[in-house]
Amino acid sequence: MPHKVFISRLKLTDFRNYAAAALTLDERHVVLTGDNGAGKTNLMEAVSLLSPGRGLRRAAYADVVRVAAPNGFSIFAELEGMEDTVEIGTGVDTSDETTARKLRINGTPAKTVDELTDHLRVLWLTPAMDGLFTGGSSERRRFLDRLVLSLDPAHGRRASDFERAMRSRNRLLSESRFDPSWLAGIEEQMASLGIAMALARQEMLGLLTRLIAETREATPFPSAALELSGFLDGQFDRPALDLEDAYAGMLREGRYRDAAAGRTLDGPHRTDLLVRHREKDMEAERCSTGEQKALLVGLILAHARLVGNLTGHAPVLLLDEIAAHLDEGRRAALFDLIDRLGGQAFMTGTDRAMFSALGERAQFFTVAHGGITKS
């Protein structure tokens, strides 16, 4: 079983509706109950910011600062991490000229937020993701890249560098005259980054597909069949250099078409994640709302198991309103599955009774009026 990573202390200052809040925790799961709007998801969002990126809501950092707070927000966590006990502090100081996120690890400024992945991996499932299979492809790409990032921390940097290069190419193409040699240099960079992104996605999907096949009988949730579409389909058995040459050629040949369109029409930014309900052999978007939710839960739990298997450390799970639409039997099975992953999970709900099957495996807190109390 993977080693357990768990948060032992959490302190928030001027974060969302919390002027100040502190939690002292043990290694068990954490259940947060309270009325809608009390701030349960806000606390989960704070934990999600212990990973690279903008957290589970993808909010601008300035937007998570408590109204009327004088100097931004801060989050402090102490955890038993992948490299022993560690203290992490992160936040934004709005008195600075920049609102860039600051990060300290054991009191030392970090060079990049990617250093967070040396200490823990954080995965989440929220009600906002319920429309993942029926919404636009951009949301599925973002979801896909979060899955990849938890296994390959460099993926986020490659993706942002690719986007930057693509914007430069689009800008050059918008000019009536452009320098072909300069454009070729940008396209070579895009080809290198774009193929690296695509291969990382394909590798993660292959690993996840194999794990799902191996564990189908051990879960009450439906199995997802996964496929990528929209970029170099069926060609990823070729060497990476051949793929880079092929993509660079596509970009070169598509210059005038892309100039007319005002955007780059080929690349990893056009990829879509296709999901099928394996047992019913049905596209996920055609499944019922309940089936889609069950598919998504099963997919997240399978990915959490994969992260634990490959890193040797179980991820911290954030499961917002996870029990709301499950019957008692499936809730109990879900809690058992979460327990077997070997990590610490944070779960929210309005009714503590929904989590009764956890028993002593969890610590319970009530959230109300910008405060958190043990219950």
Swiss-Prot record:
One of its GO terms (biological process) is double-strand break repair. SUPFAM superfamilies: P-loop containing nucleoside triphosphate hydrolases. InterPro entries: AAA+_ATPase, DNA-binding_RecF, DNA-binding_RecF_CS, P-loop_NTPase, RecF/RecN/SMC_N, RecF_2. Its main location: cytoplasm. Gene3D superfamilies: P-loop containing nucleotide triphosphate hydrolases, RecF/RecN/SMC, N-terminal domain. GO terms for cellular component: cytoplasm. PROSITE patterns: RECF_1, RECF_2. Keywords: ATP-binding, Cytoplasm, DNA damage, DNA repair, DNA replication, DNA-binding, Nucleotide-binding, SOS response. GO terms for molecular function: ATP binding; ATP hydrolysis activity; single-stranded DNA binding. It is found in: Cytoplasm. ATP binds at G34, D35, N36, G37, A38, G39, K40, T41. Pfam families: SMC_N. The keyword Cell membrane does not apply. The keyword Cytoplasm applies. Belongs to the RecF family. The RecF protein is involved in DNA metabolism; it is required for DNA replication and normal SOS inducibility. RecF binds preferentially to single-stranded, linear DNA. It also seems to bind ATP. This is DNA replication and repair protein RecF. It comes from Rhizobium rhizogenes (strain K84 / ATCC BAA-868). The gene is recF.
